[in-house]
């Protein structure tokens, strides 16, 4: 048994091609996107093919059903090249799909999770309302 921080066989199988994609597709324009604030919709569509937008969504709802550990490694790999894109993926999974999985009705899960998991829809989360503040706790 390996150490907790070593990549297992499944992780290497997923992360190897994923890292190659990131190096070839995400890295080249990262500095320019950061400078201009351009949102990389083309990369979002390509990342969707790797299942990152449904990484933590169960397969029953169209997701990849990956482990939290593998998902964290995927976000880490994206962040190595593009922090903003990594945050997009992380917030989509934790704040959007995560909250639907946690507190959504079955009807809401069936309506929203397949589109979110496939990358057809990009999740968002609103915190501040006029006149009420921003305390997420």
Locations of regions flagged by a protein language model:
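Intrinsic disorder at enzyme termini
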Residues: 1-13
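Glycine-rich flavin
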Residues: 27-137
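Short non-domain terminal segments
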Residues: 3, 16-19, 37
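A non-catalytic, amphipathic alpha-helix used as a structural packing/dimerization or gating element
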Residues: 10-24
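General helical secondary-structure elements
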Residues: 8, 15, 29-31
């Amino acid at each position: 048994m390996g150490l907790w921080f070593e990549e297992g066989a499944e992780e290497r199988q997923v992360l190897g091609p994923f890292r190659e994609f990131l190096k070839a597709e995400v890295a080249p324009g990262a500095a320019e996107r950061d400078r201009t604030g351009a949102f990389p919709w083309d990369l979002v569509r390509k990342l969707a093919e790797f299942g990152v937008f449904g990484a933590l969504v169960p397969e029953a709802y169209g997701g990849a059903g990956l482990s939290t550990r593998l998902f964290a490694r995927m976000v880490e790999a994206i962040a190595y090249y593009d922090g903003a894109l990594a945050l997009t993926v992380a917030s989509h999974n934790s704040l959007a799909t995560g909250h639907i999985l946690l507190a959504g009705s079955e009807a809401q899960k069936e309506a929203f999770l397949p589109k979110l998991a496939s990358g057809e829809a990009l999740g968002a989360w609103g915190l501040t309302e006029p006149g009420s503040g921003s305390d997420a706790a």
